[in-house]
Curated annotation (Swiss-Prot):
Family (UniProt): Belongs to the type III pantothenate kinase family.
Pathway where this protein functions: Cofactor biosynthesis; coenzyme A biosynthesis; CoA from (R)-pantothenate: step 1/5
Pfam family, one: Pan_kinase
Tagged with keyword Kinase: yes
Catalysed reactions, as listed in the record: (R)-pantothenate + ATP = (R)-4'-phosphopantothenate + ADP + H(+)
Keyword Flavoprotein found: no
Name listed for the protein in its UniProt record: Type III pantothenate kinase
Length: 258
């Protein structure tokens, strides 16, 4: 049995887990981010997924994680130590990423954003804007030399849809889809239009303004749970890479084994 690498991206909404053999992503699953869920519960879910994929737990003794949810960081460390006899490498201070962070306070930058930057720096060299669409949508900018120079943070598309439903008396919760037309013929279709096409406007305008400040048209890479859906209605992206964060974790793990 060949050794495999487990890459775990713990976000506010979901936990993205990838299994690598070398550079090949063999399997990819998403679990809900539930701070109250016990390590035993997550272990049971993961072991079931591994069994279904035909992957033996004994092969998984290399693990790397990044997290924006501290309680779940602890939970998943326990999962891998107790059930896989593996001590995860957690992306944070002291971990090599290859990314020079040029921010007022580098420690403020989320681990997931550094991981995305590490992936883009290797996979798509040169000036780059990474648009990661999840609970929040982040716009991360790399210089021509691959340094992380900042960006922007906006509410995610699902977060926006949830907020308008919760903060109004009569507007319902909606499914986020790509509408056939902009002019909605009822309340739901009007909301879907406003959320979807309005969000495309937000993304495109922020990308253009970042490029204007940089003084050049850069490569734009989209990732995150809503990347493919937004890319259906926009030509602003050069690359759509849903597994960018997992690839960044793989790259950082290899970098820290040298």
């Amino acid at each position: 049995m060949s050794e495999k690498l487990v890459a775990v991206d713990i976000g506010n909404t979901s936990v993205n887990i990838g299994i690598f053999e070398g550079e090949k992503l063999l399997a990819n699953w998403h679990l809900g981010s539930v701070a109250q869920r016990m390590a035993d519960e997550y272990a049971s879910l993961l072991l079931g997924l591994l069994q279904h994929a035909g992957i033996h737990p004994e092969e998984l003794n290399r693990v790397i994680m990044c997290s924006v949810v501290p309680p779940l960081t602890t939970t998943f460390e326990e999962v891998f130590k107790s059930y896989f006899k593996a001590a995860p490498l957690v992306v944070g201070a002291g971990i090599k990423s290859g990314v020079k962070v040029r921010m007022d306070n580098p420690r403020e930058v989320g681990a997931d954003r550094i991981v995305n930057a590490a992936a883009a720096r290797v996979l798509y060299p040169g000036a780059c804007i990474i648009v990661d669409m999840g609970t929040a949508t982040t716009f991360d900018t790399l210089s021509e030399g691959g340094a992380y120079i900042g960006g922007a943070i906006a509410p995610g598309i699902a977060t926006s849809a949830q907020a308008i439903a919760e903060k109004t008396s009569k507007l319902p919760k909606i499914e986020i889809i790509r509408p056939a037309k902009v002019i909605g013929s009822n309340t739901v279709s009007a909301m879907q239009s406003g959320i979807y096409f309005g969000y495309i406007g937000l993304v495109e305008e922020l990308v253009r303004r970042i490029q204007t400040e940089l003084g050049q048209k850069t490569r734009v890479v989209a990732t995150g749970g809503y990347a493919a859906l937004i890319a259906e209605g926009s030509r602003i992206f050069d690359i759509v890479r849903p597994d960018l964060t997992l690839q960044g974790l793989r790259i950082i793990y290899q970098m820290n084994q040298a």
